[in-house]
Amino acid sequence: MTRSDTLPDLPTVAEFVPGYEVSSWFGIGAPRNTPTQVVDKLNAEINAGLAAPKLKAHLTDLGETPLMGSPTDFGKLIVEETEKWGRVIRAANIKPERLIRGLR
């Protein structure tokens, strides 16, 4: 884990707790079978938007690190995160609970 560009003097949790690794990320998906040319166009426009200085600065001010990539990159991230957190959940024997009243 690397230090935040916004607060470079603030140590990461991993500097105090060896092996600590948690991050959050956001992504945009499209329905299955969306034509490749549509996905590629959306990806190019989203990457261009994230690279725009004004938006990039705003996201950075919010403590976010805008990352651009391809649909393949994002798919790999989803698989890696699912596998990693699946192992954690199984090792800790975490079971789902009904958290929201009325949700079944």
What kind of region is each of these model predictions?
Residues 1-104:
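Conserved, function-defining micro-sites of small-solute handling proteins
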